[in-house]
Amino acid sequence: MTSYSDKGEKPERGRFLHFHSVTFWVGNAKQAASYYCSKIGFEPLAYKGLETGSREVVSHVVKQDKIVFVFSSALNPWNKEMGDHLVKHGDGVKDIAFEVEDCDYIVQKARERGAIIVREEVCCAADVRGHHTPLDRARQVWEGTLVEKMTFCLDSRPQPSQTLLHRLLLSKLPKCGLEIIDHIVGNQPDQEMESASQWYMRNLQFHRFWSVDDTQIHTEYSALRSVVMANYEESIKMPINEPAPGKKKSQIQEYVDYNGGAGVQHIALKTEDIITAIRSLRERGVEFLAVPFTYYKQLQEKLKSAKIRVKESIDVLEELKILVDYDEKGYLLQIFTKPMQDRPTVFLEVIQRNNHQGFGAGNFNSLFKAFEEEQELRGNLTDTDPNGVPFRL
């Protein structure tokens, strides 16, 4: 594992603040939004569709504390862009929005460095000016959007069905306590991680924050490489993974195959009380990965000589299958859902940080084994050729 202290030159102007929202393109926005509300603890926030004058696209916006997800679907059969996207990639992330200061300057510098500006929009809603500028990621499935003081230009009045959903169901379910987006992870095909990281460095003036390679993260069968990109203030972190050659197809390669290329693998949602959050999510029916049963026995032995003390009960963490990673300064707790749709692509992470800014590298091997068990169930833990290239089914 490598940590980087060099942030590069501080940008003259413009500042990335935090994740603003994540937009998914899905086959049925109403059903997807309802699923994330009933399962993950979101609540309806805004809507646009035929009733609000939107004739081409319907969007349902849901919110939990400072986390905002937008689910969008085509309304008409001739929407080729959204239709082709769904056929190739399935339901998944189309856009990641960052809230920024001085959007005009950031866009100007990105354009000078070669970024493709998809479109520029100025939105006025509730007397707040919003500047919405999507950036095209070369050869990527998803776009990045810069948002300055943005409020959604959607009908903020909940639809009758949304009000009914909250009154009859959501208000009776346990609260999950998920607060903010901690980080968002992208997967790339082999040998494309470096070009993706260079895009962030060149166009957005991000820097390398942390990295691991396949000599550090591997099992008997598969491996990965990963680099984390961050803005100057390090309030936004974007890990980028790529598969490394192994005896069998890695879970990163499985993702790339089913997603039809690069894309967002998972979204990490931060909480201050992961035990309550996971109890609530399990009560709501969310399924999580389970690491090998030996994990917690080994963890207890390691913690005996550790410089830090985990405040939470290890027995409770084992009961809920929550993982622990630590260093001499602090620790984090994390757990991963199974895929949120039928394709084994996008999933969620729930994370609690206690003076620890890592990404669970100490858990990667155990997680890889858990992923491999799921791959085996799907029939996707398949052999590779002598060069580590997966055989196609």
UniProtKB/Swiss-Prot annotation:
InterPro entries: 4OHPhenylPyrv_dOase (IPR005956), 4OHPhenylPyrv_dOase_C (IPR041735), 4OHPhenylPyrv_dOase_N (IPR041736), Glyas_Bleomycin-R_OHBP_Dase (IPR029068), Glyas_Fos-R_dOase_dom (IPR004360), VOC (IPR037523). It holds the Pfam family Glyoxalase. GO terms for cellular component: endoplasmic reticulum membrane; Golgi membrane. Liver. Its main location: cytoplasm. One of its GO terms (biological process) is L-phenylalanine catabolic process. Pathway: Amino-acid degradation; L-phenylalanine degradation; acetoacetate and fumarate from L-phenylalanine: step 3/6. It catalyses: 3-(4-hydroxyphenyl)pyruvate + O2 = homogentisate + CO2. PANTHER family: 4-HYDROXYPHENYLPYRUVATE DIOXYGENASE. Its cofactor is Fe cation. Its EC number is 1.13.11.27. The modification N-acetylthreonine is found at residue 2. Catalyzes the conversion of 4-hydroxyphenylpyruvic acid to homogentisic acid, one of the steps in tyrosine catabolism. Binds 1 Fe cation per subunit. This is 4-hydroxyphenylpyruvate dioxygenase. The modification Phosphoserine is found at residues 211, 226, 250. Fe cation binds at residues 183, 266, 349. GO terms for molecular function: 4-hydroxyphenylpyruvate dioxygenase activity; metal ion binding; protein homodimerization activity. It is an enzyme of class 1 (oxidoreductase). Belongs to the 4HPPD family.
